[in-house]
Every structure is written in C-alpha cells, then in structure tokens.
Swiss-Prot record:
Assigned protein family: Belongs to the universal ribosomal protein uS7 family.
Alphabetical list of Pfam families matching this protein: Ribosomal_S7 (PF00177)
Record-linked CDD domains: uS7_Chloroplast (cd14871)
Superkingdom of the source species: Eukaryota
Subunit structure: Part of the 30S ribosomal subunit.
Gene this chain is encoded by: rps7
Protein name in the entry: Small ribosomal subunit protein uS7c
Organism lineage string: Eukaryota, Viridiplantae, Streptophyta, Embryophyta, Tracheophyta
Organism: Lactoris fernandeziana
Keywords: Chloroplast, Plastid, Ribonucleoprotein, Ribosomal protein, RNA-binding, rRNA-binding
Length: 155
C-alpha cells in the first residue's frame, strides 16, 4: 500500500471585481504566456460588451452559457483486446465546467472578429441562447457517447 498522502483538491479563488469563481476559472483559461492582467482585461471587456448587447446581468449570461455547454458524459479511448473503443464515461461538475470553458474559448478563438473580447462576448451570448460552436461541440460529444453506449461496460 502506498504511504503517499492524497492530494487535497484546490478550490478556485474568486476574482477581485465580481467575486466569482467561474470568472476566475475563465481568466485562468484565457491566460497566455503568464499575462494574467491582459486576460482580466479581455474578460472584463467581454463582460461589458455582453452588458451592452443583452442589457441583462452579464454574470447570469456567463453562468447560463457555461451551464448550457457543460457536458454530462464524455468518451474516453480504452484499449481492449487489441482494439481501441470509445467508452462513454460520466464526469463530475468541476471537470465538466473546465471542459465547457475550454470549448467556449476554442470556439471564440476560431470566430472571425476584431479582438478576443468581442469574439468571447459573441460566443457567450450565442451559447446562452443555445447556439454557437461550443454548444455544437457538446452535442457532438453526447452523440458520440450515445453511439458508443454498447461499450459502457468497459469502464
């Protein structure tokens, strides 16, 4: 038996302005080359644009977008008897949120547009309304899981 202790799960800190953990998770994913202040600027500009577009609370739009994109099931490649199967596996809420944030950022980076704040705000508004690339990615993942339901016992 291992004598090594189990690692404690780190809790996400909240950001200085909105006091929200989701915002901080999003900032940490936007972050490139250690430029956190730039990541905060991008997100806060995106939030202002969301406020202007929808005229509702931008944090509720953000929550709704992430809730809409969060997957319940993902597929993992499992090698069984020389062949690789895509095995559907349920994931927890934290992992699901992390995936949702990653998908939202990938989708917004792919978008044509002026700057990242504009693209991110557009993607978040679309995701909150039930459209956009990130939602399509979630549906695609769920379809894959449904198609490979026969391999669920390989968990």
């Amino acid at each position: 038996m291992s004598r090594r202790g189990t690692a404690e799960e780190k809790t996400a800190k909240s950001d200085p302005i909105y006091r929200n953990r989701l915002v901080n998770m999003l900032v940490n994913r936007i972050l490139k080359h250690g430029k956190k202040s730039l990541a905060y600027q991008i997100l806060y500009r995106a939030v202002k644009k969301i406020q202007q577009k929808t005229e509702t609370n931008p944090l509720s739009v953000l929550r709704q977008a992430i809730r809409g994109v969060t997957p319940d099931i993902v597929v993992k490649a499992r090698r069984v008897g020389g062949s690789t199967h895509q095995v559907p596996i349920e994931i927890g809420s934290t992992q699901g949120k992390a995936l949702a944030i990653r998908w939202l950022l990938v989708a917004s980076r792919k978008r044509p547009g002026r700057n990242m704040a504009f693209k991110l705000s557009s993607e978040l508004v679309d995701a909150a309304k039930g459209g956009g690339d990130a939602i399509r990615k979630k549906e695609e993942t769920h379809k894959m899981a449904e198609a490979n339901r026969a391999f669920a016992h390989f968990r």
